[in-house]
């Protein structure tokens, strides 16, 4: 009987081949920061607080009928200046990479650390804006999907009874127009979760972005339009549990969709510590804390704040979703 030698008998000589083509990893779709009013804080300004100003709304209360010729009005219209303050907070993150890892690595961990640090900074900044809009802002406009009475009713309802309907976002547009909210490029902007977007796309009046992209430039992440609102998807939506209205819950079933016009909210823009284009520091070399140069440290820092500037200029729509 012939003896045949195959790979199974000498399998210990074979080693794994490692592909140097890295697989893609999940990167969140972020939308809110691009529509914020950005306020610079110059270096050596003597403050850690940014203050936005606005004059009071137009009013006819001081206009008088002048019954007698040559007689001036008896009263005067007073101007008042309102302000909104935001205290900046410093944030930071570091990634330490050992010399042994760098000596034996298949991939450049320093290069990847720089890349992921920038993505982490952008994600963190967007979450700060999201949490500000979803917080208990005085005077915020809210709407409930499917004609439900209030947030508690949305929380108690089934998904089918709390899903967004065709006319729900018309109410958002109407509310903003009633408040004289300035538009952004002739439309309002809506930022929704992918699940709510799925529900919206099934409504009869939905207009896909592809149908008007030839004549209008699209925002990053834009998916379509309805009732004068251009919708964008975010994968980091504000979720809540149906009982605690203004508290983010990653496993919450109530989705907050934000519809807004111009200057609804603002963020700081400190050139040297901005999370949008952060300065990433790579520290290498022996020091008192690392005398043998055993670590390379990659990190960033930001000095940042987000604030609602005019609560009348945005609407938070609460809903559930049929997506499962």
Question: Which residue ranges define each predicted feature?
Answer:
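N-terminal "assembly arms/tails" that initiate or stabilize quaternary assembly
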Residues: 1-86, 318
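Beta-strand elements of well-folded, non-transmembrane domains
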Residues: 56, 99, 302-306
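Short, solvent-exposed loop/turn segments at the edges of secondary structure
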Residues: 88-90, 185, 293
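Short, low-complexity, charged/polar segments at coil/turn and helix-coil boundaries
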Residues: 24-62, 134, 163-214
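Short acidic, glycine/tyrosine-flanked loop/strand segments centered on an H-E-D-like triad
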Residues: 77-105, 277
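Sequence/fold signature of self-assembling virion shell proteins
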Residues: 2-33, 151-173, 197-324
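Alpha-helical scaffold segments that mediate packing/assembly in large oligomeric complexes
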Residues: 101-178, 195, 324
